[in-house]
Amino acid sequence: MSSRRDAREQVMKTLYANEQTDGDAEQALHALVRVPLDEDPSTRDFAEHLFRETLKTMEEADEIIEKHADNWEIHRIAAIDRSLLRMATTELLKFEEVPPKVSVDEAIEIAKRYSTPRSGTFVNGVIDAILLDLHDQGRLNKTGRGLIGMDTIQERAGSS
């Protein structure tokens, strides 16, 4: 498991806990991100940044998710799936250095591990539709390593 995977799993847990308890985001961040990832500062920093950006972007992400989750209102999506979709959408929108394929694949794999048997397929369908739509809108602003795989997305977007 990559250290970024560890970070994403902890962020998903933190988003979930924060939403379920309507609690203090800083307390959740400390307990579920800072303490478990304390020995790896770069992973911890990535996780903290992802958590904070996801909270900042949540309203926008929810609108995007609802648009692509056919017949699903955001509050009806399983809480873990909702957290993962918010996190992955935030990565697509705000993390220029993260390749879109990585954001998508990580969300799917974490969904398979932590959520329902069908969650991997559901998350895949929704986040893939989001990815193509963001590309078509010119909202995937990737640089450096984030450009890896963009040619494949452009090909897929052109054929849809």
Curated annotation (Swiss-Prot):
GO annotation terms (biological process): DNA-templated transcription termination; transcription antitermination
Taxonomy of the source species: Bacteria, Pseudomonadati, Rhodothermota, Rhodothermia, Rhodothermales
InterPro entries: NusB-like_sf, NusB_fam, NusB_RsmB_TIM44
Molecular function in Gene Ontology: RNA binding
Top-rank taxon: Bacteria
Entry-linked Pfam families: NusB
Family: Belongs to the NusB family.
Keywords: RNA-binding, Transcription, Transcription antitermination, Transcription regulation
GO terms under cellular component: cytosol
Protein name in UniProt: Transcription antitermination protein NusB
Gene3D superfamilies per UniProt: NusB-like
Transcription regulation as UniProt keyword: yes
Function field: Involved in transcription antitermination. Required for transcription of ribosomal RNA (rRNA) genes. Binds specifically to the boxA antiterminator sequence of the ribosomal RNA (rrn) operons.
